[in-house]
Amino acid sequence: MARFGTQKLYIDGAYVDAGSDATFEAINPATGEVLAHVQRATQADVEKAVESAERGQKVWAAMTAMQRSRILRRAVDILRERNDELAMLETLDTGKSYSETRYVDIVTGADVLEYYAGLVPAIEGEQIPLRESSFVYTRREPLGVTVGIGAWNYPIQIALWKSAPALAAGNAMIFKPSEVTSLTTLKLAEIFTEAGLPNGVFNVLTGSGREVGTWLTEHPRIEKVSFTGGTTTGKKVMASASSSSLKEVTMELGGKSPLIICDDADLDKAADIAMMANFYSSGQVCTNGTRVFVPAAMKAAFEAKIAERVARIRAGNPEDENTNFGPLVSFQHMESVLSYIAKGKEEGARVLCGGERLTAGDFAKGAFVAPTVFTDCTDDMTIVKEEIFGPVMSILSYETEEEVIRRANDTEYGLAAGVCTNDISRAHRIIHKLEAGICWINAWGESPAEMPVGGYKQSGVGRENGVSSLAQYTRIKSVQVELGGYNSVF
């Protein structure tokens, strides 16, 4: 018997059985334990969810802004009250250390929901005078029923990042979590209902992206799709969304982000930043700065500082609060990361740290890969060009500022970038030339609710978080009013 039994779909404010008996397993990647059997939604379930969302959205949109704001704020309170319980469930399902999920995943997701709950009454139109007898006013109206499709690395946080602006603007959302990590999103649906969200305004359908995701993105009555995942899949989602009914889309996709360390940087601080940019969440963060550019004259000193810090990583049971490095999200993903590590060795990169699966003792039960650092890397290596999504850092040396900017931009991706320097003018000069949507100076990784995040090039379309994202969940209606007479040419 799985610890959490059978997990059902969440439609119209309640758990309901899927239209078939098909299920998939939720597996703890630290131990291989089957946590739950999760039901697979059918196409008929998708129709039920859409119909439910359409009904609920009308009720939700008819509420006053303050009523909607209060309900979302109650959901924030419940999330914070249940933080530790939800964090442990996230740890079991994803393998991320409890020392991370307890202080980041639910906390930052709740922050985003609170941020948008506060913005609900600020959704306003404009009044535009034309002449003495006429003016135009605009209304920002909700889109209707929207879809969120999540990734497996931050399940509940991503669900909140997508649902918060959608619900704040008066829409309903049908959310499909990753098949790999579905459990906490179902709990979020419970919390929204407990907070007073009308039935149907947040539905959760579990299943594969190939089936459930496609049925949702192609559905003619869905108005917008917000997707987080790989670039290849994102292109397919975007194509199906546009070909079916010209849906609006937001895409948060892959990256191969550069971290540039300048010759005047504090090397200890730069090493700390590089560690967070590569090994936080066991390297499974879309914005990770996996291409670390270091001045050639400083490379040996930087390598020594990185090796010293890697040795301090505490890999282990993610349920132990002392652990700060857990397994990868699945055994399948572990094999993918190990194949990249093998490719790096084959192509001539030098292994500074790690480079293998962890198998001693209890590690053998889980999907653990050692924190890995390659050095003497070149731009044409597979590990430097392709997104690995694991704990693999590549160190590259450079000579001049002009050279490193050119090489940093020589990628199909443009999600994130960072610069370490004590010269603030230099920092801004370099950042302004980097082709990336999310940038940090002397820091890495923080994405507060107020900060719009999203990529350039193949890394995405649109933004999440910040004021601008709220507008993406509305459409503008323009109304001209004539107070005087009307002259016809006929």
UniProtKB/Swiss-Prot annotation:
Residues where NAD(+) binds: 150-152, 176-179, 230-233, 254, 286, 387
GO MF, one annotated term: betaine-aldehyde dehydrogenase (NAD+) activity
EC number in record: 1.2.1.8
Enzyme class label: oxidoreductase
Seems to be a necessary countercharge to the potassium cations, annotated site positions: 248
Keywords: Metal-binding, NAD, NADP, Oxidation, Oxidoreductase, Potassium
Known cofactor(s): K(+)
Cysteine sulfenic acid (-SOH) carried by residues: 286
InterPro entries cross-referenced by the UniProt entry: Ald_DH/histidinol_DH, Ald_DH_C, Ald_DH_CS_CYS, Ald_DH_CS_GLU, Ald_DH_N, Aldehyde_DH_dom, BADH
Binding site for K(+) 1: 27, 93, 180
GO biological process assignments: glycine betaine biosynthetic process from choline
Annotated positions binding K(+) 2: 246, 457, 460
Active site (UniProt): 162, 252, 286, 464
Reaction catalysed by this enzyme: betaine aldehyde + NAD(+) + H2O = glycine betaine + NADH + 2 H(+)
Quaternary structure (record): Dimer of dimers.
UniProt record similarity statement: Belongs to the aldehyde dehydrogenase family.
Function text: Involved in the biosynthesis of the osmoprotectant glycine betaine. Catalyzes the irreversible oxidation of betaine aldehyde to the corresponding acid.
Protein name per Swiss-Prot or TrEMBL: Betaine aldehyde dehydrogenase
Species lineage: Bacteria, Pseudomonadati, Pseudomonadota, Gammaproteobacteria, Pseudomonadales
